[in-house]
């Protein structure tokens, strides 16, 4: 039998120390990685529950194991809340991650070798949208679209031209590094013109969509996938949604998730999703998402005033790309310099980037995490000022030390977990 007094620190101090150091890092660093966020203690409680012990292959009411009556309730709660949150007719809460959700959709709707049309990774897409290093680019014939070189927005004319030329079986909308509003209706129009499925990967903007501050792709896409962390602020996991009304597609999706791509679901993570979905249904969640966008816009305004180039000219969501080509600063060096000052970002390729993905000429910056800890426009502008100070004085240790001290002081005023 296990005593509930058992803990990691007494048994494995080396691991406990690493975990404690990560807690300290999160509290004393400003987190600007657009795909990261802080989940609530309720979400972490669910993930650390005894539900982790239960195997439950199958779906609620149709399991391959006994003793699933309680996890059936848990999963159905998550399904029902996901449907309510996004206005969906169908929801599968079992995918372990966004990539697994995308893989399941590919397997459900395509055959190996079929053509897919997705956004280029170097222009803001995701690995699973047809990158040659990913299953989506290895198993399928991937064609890639990008941004209009003049406006920095999605080049819908190119999407349409490529669709007519290559006749893809599926078109993918969505992104990992694009700061504009996507015209989901236009994507569906193009998909219908060539008889293609439309898959929308809304992983980055799911929280914004749930709160009604970003267009919902459900009325337009055949299938929508997402992660459940990022702007949604839940556990690190995946979700498949649809409102297409085609029961045959829903059946294919379920079979593709299990047994096609996965075995048993992670019941403790599904419980955490159920909690996160209920949190996202609360009125304060909309206010949070509105502040996420306001903070991103505030940061952009400061950086533009300081002479920095923002891809697409600004932001309408939670993230933006800082183009450093004209500053002759690599994304790798900028990332390291900011990290030394307790500001965490990620290097990112920018359109027409002359440098490799391991070096890059840009930074991706996001506001979900700083907003989650309570930052408003005032603090967001201060953070942007610090970033510019460091980038304007690359290699100046005195600037880094000064900013680091000020960052720690600000973080102390806005603890993540009190």
From Swiss-Prot:
Pathway recorded for this protein: One-carbon metabolism; tetrahydrofolate interconversion; Amino-acid biosynthesis; glycine biosynthesis; glycine from L-serine: step 1/1
Keyword Cytoplasm: yes
Enzyme Commission code: 2.1.2.1
Ion transport found in the keyword field: no
A molecular-function term among this protein's GO annotations: glycine hydroxymethyltransferase activity
EC category name: transferase
Classification via Gene3D superfamilies: Aspartate Aminotransferase, domain 1 (3.90.1150.10), Type I PLP-dependent aspartate aminotransferase-like (Major domain) (3.40.640.10)
Major localization class: cytoplasm
Annotated site (Plays an important role in substrate specificity): 229
Cofactor: pyridoxal 5'-phosphate
Residues reported to bind (6S)-5,6,7,8-tetrahydrofolate: 121, 125-127, 356-358
Catalytic activity: (6R)-5,10-methylene-5,6,7,8-tetrahydrofolate + glycine + H2O = (6S)-5,6,7,8-tetrahydrofolate + L-serine
Transmembrane domains' residue ranges: none
GO biological process, alphabetically ordered: glycine biosynthetic process from serine; tetrahydrofolate interconversion
InterPro entries the record matches: PyrdxlP-dep_Trfase, PyrdxlP-dep_Trfase_major, PyrdxlP-dep_Trfase_small, Ser_HO-MeTrfase, Ser_HO-MeTrfase-like, Ser_HO-MeTrfase_PLP_BS, SHMT-like_dom
Keywords, sorted A to Z: Amino-acid biosynthesis, Cytoplasm, One-carbon metabolism, Pyridoxal phosphate, Transferase
Cellular component, GO annotation: cytosol
Annotated compartments: Cytoplasm
Sequence positions bearing N6-(pyridoxal phosphate)lysine: 230
Function: Catalyzes the reversible interconversion of serine and glycine with tetrahydrofolate (THF) serving as the one-carbon carrier. This reaction serves as the major source of one-carbon groups required for the biosynthesis of purines, thymidylate, methionine, and other important biomolecules. Also exhibits THF-independent aldolase activity toward beta-hydroxyamino acids, producing glycine and aldehydes, via a retro-aldol mechanism.
Family classification: Belongs to the SHMT family.
Subunit structure as annotated in this protein's UniProt entry: Homodimer.
Entry protein name: Serine hydroxymethyltransferase
